């Protein structure tokens, strides 16, 4: 039995959502082959860092390679479209054909079934994040053989909106949380009285960055009492242009003026490892954002939140904006000083209980680490698959 965990992205932010499962599978005595497949050097480095001695010993590491044609195409189009990410499947079909199970964090892997005909390959989706956006619950989710999810909110929406069969969904908690169990928050800006994490999403139709981001930075430059960690979604500045397909938009994140880079109370991180490993969501006192699912990681410990509705959405009562119930929603950075001034009081009098309810509906956590729960599901699915294969083989032999 060959089970592979695929990491195929420009950035490392998805690794923490499924690599802990591979590690738990290896430590739990799974008797099949466990493989981690990466598509670039950045991902390989992150996998080796988190996986330690298991990578290359109990867990085989395969580095997928693009063809020369893909490399040429990618060099021309990579500023707009992730061609290498899309074509890596075609270029490595023999590897994917050799697998029984493929565990993935994203949906482009469904190309293996839909375009390349690998219908016998069982693909398990771990998801990456526990956010509320509709794209996380689109019909593509029903194309997976099994989906692992964090809690009842996600399961219920997958069944109701994506059409996933209830038998094809398992609640396992949130494996990424296993990586920070017992860790203490870092003090990122020690001179600041309070630290705010500004975490805008890359999607132009949802993000506050394109319209209001520089005004947000300006506010903190002039208000040194509050420290600012500007750690946007790692894909906001990854390419020259941001292209979204769920609602087609193209925009440019642009440059960050030098004056913000020199601010003593401003920490800017556009995509380092810390942007993906919960360092900043643990370290901040207040969350400021728009559509990123990292809000739910921030709620691991309830704290004040502020949301910037830069597009004037009518959001109340809409499940795609459920996370905005965790704090005050403002329409402009001009409202930020007052929102920050009352954030602590509003948190205690209005939002703390709501946050705890939201966290409980989003994450089903217990004393068993989430990665071990996920590994148990994969082991069961693999055993069921092996049993069915043996029965089919015996039946074929008996009728021969």
Q: Model regions: which residues?
A:
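Active-site and donor-binding regions of nucleotide-sugar-utilizing enzymes
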Residues: 6-24, 35-181
